[in-house]
Swiss-Prot record:
It is found in: Secreted. This is Kallikrein-15. Its EC number is 3.4.21.-. InterPro entries: Peptidase_S1_PA, Peptidase_S1_PA_chymotrypsin, Peptidase_S1A, Trypsin_dom, TRYPSIN_HIS. Glycans are attached at N171, N232. The gene is KLK15. GO terms for biological process: protein maturation; proteolysis. It comes from Homo sapiens (Human). It holds the Pfam family Trypsin. Residues 1-16 form the signal peptide.
Length: 256
């Protein structure tokens, strides 16, 4: 339920929880996630996404906006270090059965006007040939919300949250449907998959929406929703299960 908040709200918020960041990870090695995409709306960072072919990007349907721009090869959103590519979109195609309230079918395809130039820093993610297994090790990445607590200031106005400049990565694992259903009773469907880290919860937060969950080098999930607030929960995050949508992805790309 943490559909992406506006940037101004994120930057103005305060964190009441002791800890370094809401996404419990570290800065990714630059360009170690070459499929990572940053989506922009009117010049502002909006969501994450994944490149899946030179012409196509995959994200969450709740990230849809009217004026979308795509940035490839990014690491530090405030600096240009060479591999960045800016693209416009000719088609934005959310799943026809997307339901915002229930988060069902939270998946979207974007067709690029000009194809991506593939290189070591810009490379498509590999789509799955099977669904993920409980316990499988994964990496979630994004420019989502982080917190910075000065010593002795946790919970005070000086304990600020912000969107980082650099891409962050966190190591998490797939949670079984049975276990995840205990956290979100009656809310999960077979098109969703849960992932998190034991004792630390979701690991992803506002701003990570639409970004990749990669397991063994395979794109298995799209950051979709989770518990609120994400800095104060042990519940896992919920991801759109990419393996369930392979036919829709392929047919949509073929028709467009």
């Amino acid at each position: 339920m943490w559909l992406l908040l506006t940037l101004s709200f994120l930057l103005a918020s305060t964190a009441a929880q002791d800890g370094d960041k809401l996404l419990e990870g570290d800065e990714c090695a630059p360009h170690s996630q070459p499929w990572q995409v940053a989506l922009y709306e009117r010049g502002r960072f909006n969501c994450g996404a994944s490149l899946i072919s030179p012409h196509w990007v995959l994200s969450a349907a709740h990230c849809q906006s009217r004026f979308m721009r795509v940035r490839l090869g990014e690491h530090n959103l405030r600096k240009r270090d060479g591999p960045e590519q800016l693209r416009t979109t000719s088609r934005v195609i959310p799943h026809p059965r997307y339901e915002a309230r229930s988060h069902r079918n939270d998946i979207m395809l974007l067709r690029l006007v000009q194809p991506a130039r593939l290189n070591p820093q810009v490379r498509p993610a590999v789509l799955p040939t099977r669904c993920p297994h409980p316990g499988e090790a994964c990496v979630v990445s994004g420019w989502g919300l982080v917190s910075h607590n000065e010593p002795g200031t946790a919970g005070s106005p000086r304990s600020q949250v912000s969107l980082p400049d650099t891409l962050h990565c966190a190591n998490i694992s797939i949670i079984s449907d049975t276990s995840c259903d205990k956290s979100y009773p009656g809310r999960l469907t077979n098109t969703m998959v849960c992932a998190g880290a034991e004792g630390r919860g979701a690991e992803s937060c506002e701003g990570d929406s639409g970004g990749p969950l990669v397991c063994g080098g395979i794109l298995q999930g799209i950051v979709s929703w989770g518990d609120v607030p994400c800095d104060n929960t042990t519940k896992p995050g919920v991801y759109t299960k990419v393996c369930h949508y392979l036919e829709w992805i392929r047919e949509t790309m073929k028709r467009n």
